[in-house]
Amino acid sequence: MNVRRSLLGLTFCTCYLASHLTNKYVLSVLKFTYPTLFQGWQTFIGGLLLHMSWKLGWVELHSSPRSDVLIWLPASALFVGIIYAGSKALSRLAVPVFFILHNVAEVLTCGYQKCVWKEKTSLSKICSALFLLAAAGCLPFQDSQFDPDGYFWALIHIFCVGSYKILRKSRKPTVLSDIDQQYLNYIFSMVLLAFASHPTGDLFGALDFPFLYFYRFHGSCCASGVLGFFLMLSTVRLRSILAPGQCAAWILCAKVVTAGLSMLLFDMALTKATVGCFLLGGLGEALLVFSERRSSS
């Protein structure tokens, strides 16, 4: 059982690493900054592969009542905001910077649980939230590659991620499984982004993309869709088999490896102050793992 869990964790880390680095390559190196098309393609591939997996009997999809589907639509709308704003932010920000800002969503979730749901929060989790918030708050002032648009889209991404987590927790228990929820997210995102591609200008703007007929662009886009699907699948499996503390530990491991390799593969200006922000954010996330492990033990 321990070997199986370790293999699952390593599979998740590999998918996490490959998916984020591939997306960063398409967005920042090839500069395919048309999120309605890029994310629409990824959700199309994800939905198609998930449907094929269901037909082959590899995953279970349940026939849900229309009322449950309608109740889930606000979460699907937030999912669109997550992937759209995340794509815009990642195209302009370094991967470690994006991760530090993304972690603020945990602060929003923690604050909502304590202030609105009146849940008991451990001291380690409060300290974790403060460290994550401090790291993200100091980073814009120390980032030598500061990009206002990148940070703006990161804020929208943070809000959508935090709201999605809160909404998802408030709907438990639900007849929709994690796979059912993701399938609905894929369908809703694919349809909405397809309709949005024309008014946003992405549909015709992409015709002027310089690498439109290059194999490396086609290969990278195909890889991003497939890797995104396997990342989703491995994440669902990880959360269904492992305790929350163990899941958080694997996610932290995946983020550290991905952030470290991204600094070697993509251009990034490092200063002592930015490294300090990264370390503070890492400490905050390590404390979050510790608090999750204590609460689940």
UniProtKB/Swiss-Prot annotation:
Q: Which UniProt keywords apply?
A: Golgi apparatus, Membrane, Sugar transport, Transmembrane, Transmembrane helix, Transport
As one GO molecular function, the record gives:
UDP-N-acetylglucosamine transmembrane transporter activity
Tissue distribution of the protein: Widely expressed with high expression in lung.
Q: Which residues cross the membrane?
A: 7-29, 32-52, 69-89, 93-113, 121-141, 146-166, 187-207, 211-231, 250-270, 271-291
Q: Which GO terms describe its cellular component?
A: Golgi apparatus; membrane
Q: InterPro entries recorded for this chain?
A: TPT_transporter
The entry summarizes the disruption phenotype as follows: Deficient mice are grossly normal and show similar body weight, total cholesterol in serum and triglyceride in serum with wild-type mice. However, Tmem241 ablation causes ectopic cholesterol accumulation in lung cells, lung inflammatory infiltration and hypokinesia.
Domain of life from the UniProt record: Eukaryota
Task: Return one Gene Ontology term, BP aspect.
Answer: UDP-N-acetylglucosamine transmembrane transport
Kindly give the membrane topology term recorded for this protein.
Multi-pass membrane protein
Record flagged with keyword Amino-acid biosynthesis: no
Compartment(s) of residence: Golgi apparatus, cis-Golgi network membrane
Q: What is its main location?
A: Golgi
Q: Which family does it belong to?
A: Belongs to the nucleotide-sugar transporter family. SLC35A subfamily.
PANTHER family tied to this protein: SOLUTE CARRIER FAMILY 35
Task: Name the job this protein performs.
Answer: Golgi-localized UDP-N-acetylglucosamine (UDP-GlcNAc) transporter that transports UDP-N-acetylglucosamine into Golgi lumen. Contributes to lysosomal targeting of NPC2, a key protein required for lysosomal cholesterol exiting, and that utilizes the mannose-6-phosphate (M6P) modification pathway for its lysosomal targeting.
Tell me what this protein is called. Answer: UDP-N-acetylglucosamine transporter TMEM241
